[in-house]
């Protein structure tokens, strides 16, 4: 392989924005923040849980005058 043309493959931490779970791995991308991970995603947990990291649900409810149930 040629020297100096490949990206650095180093330790990285992927952090979940929903549950603050940290996944240690190796990557060329560096540290990343994920919106949702396998620890809190409803498909993997089997639980229906509303994850709203950007306030979209509240904005929708205010816009259409909906109440929490």
Curated annotation (Swiss-Prot):
Belongs to the bacterial ribosomal protein bL31 family. Type A subfamily. It comes from the Bacteria. Keywords: Ribonucleoprotein, Ribosomal protein, RNA-binding, rRNA-binding. The keyword Magnesium does not apply. GO terms for cellular component: ribonucleoprotein complex; ribosome. Pfam families: Ribosomal_L31. Transmembrane segments: none annotated. It comes from Magnetococcus marinus (strain ATCC BAA-1437 / JCM 17883 / MC-1). GO terms for biological process: translation. Part of the 50S ribosomal subunit. The gene is rpmE. Binds the 23S rRNA. One of its GO terms (molecular function) is structural constituent of ribosome. This is Large ribosomal subunit protein bL31. SUPFAM superfamilies: L28p-like. The keyword Zinc does not apply.
């Amino acid at each position: 392989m040629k020297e100096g043309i490949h990206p650095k493959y180093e330790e990285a931490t992927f952090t979940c924005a929903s549950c603050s779970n940290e996944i240690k791995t190796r990557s060329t991308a560096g540290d990343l923040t994920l919106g949702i991970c396998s620890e809190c995603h409803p498909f993997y947990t089997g639980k229906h849980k509303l994850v709203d990291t950007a306030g979209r649900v509240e904005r929708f409810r205010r816009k259409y005058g909906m109440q929490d149930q």
